[in-house]
């Protein structure tokens, strides 16, 4: 009986002190870096504002994925048509933006903030003012950052959106 106890203790001791390198090893998990950095997302949004105010539809639409959606319903073709109309009817556009959040995900980024667009209409002394919340979902396609989805709303006020600015 005494020998069994000694053998049992010896076997347990061997298992506990057995060199760790002989045990089964699991490779360490390496997390993939995000496909978009916060700085890249910020630069992209700055480029978006710049191209919007230059009103060149070709340059501007390069920022959108061909599968892009606007306000949960407009397709790429609809988006292009909408912005083309806006650019065609504008003498100039001013775009103010305050980014509140940039969230980085494995597959992209979400950028949220508030915008204010002042649209000087062609052949009119009036300017339209639009403002509200905005959100972009960004992805990387073929190595290029693009808009997957853009959603925005408008703050409605009791006064008219047409303002005679000097």
Enumerate the predicted regions with their spans.
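Bacterial N-terminal signal peptides that target proteins for export
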Residues: 1-10
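Bacterial N-terminal signal peptides
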Residues: 9-18
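Short, low-complexity N-terminal intrinsically disordered segments enriched in polar/charged residues
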Residues: 22-57, 62, 66
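Short beta-strand edge/turn micro-motifs at domain boundaries
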Residues: 25-30, 34, 110, 129-166
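A short gly/proline-enriched turn/hairpin at secondary-structure junctions
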Residues: 63-76
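Solvent-exposed loop/turn segments at secondary-structure junctions
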Residues: 67-69, 117-119, 153-157
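Surface-exposed, charged secondary-structure patches
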Residues: 84-126
């Amino acid at each position: 009986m005494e020998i069994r106890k000694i053998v049992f203790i010896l076997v347990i001791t061997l298992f506990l002190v057995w060199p760790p390198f002989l045990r089964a090893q699991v490779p360490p998990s390496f997390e993939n870096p995000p496909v978009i950095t916060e700085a890249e997302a910020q630069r992209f949004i700055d480029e978006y504002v710049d191209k919007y105010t230059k009103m060149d539809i070709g340059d501007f639409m390069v920022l959108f994925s061909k599968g892009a959606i606007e306000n949960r319903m407009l397709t790429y073709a609809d988006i292009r048509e909408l912005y083309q109309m806006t650019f065609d009817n504008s003498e100039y556009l001013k775009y103010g933006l305050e980014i509140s959040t940039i969230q980085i995900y494995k597959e992209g980024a979400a950028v949220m903030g508030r915008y204010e667009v002042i649209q000087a209409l062609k052949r009119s002394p009036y300017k339209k003012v639009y403002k509200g919340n905005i959100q972009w979902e960004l992805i990387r396609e073929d190595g290029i950052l693009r808009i997957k989805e853009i959603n925005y709303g408008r703050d409605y006020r009791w006064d008219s959106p047409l303002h005679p600015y000097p």
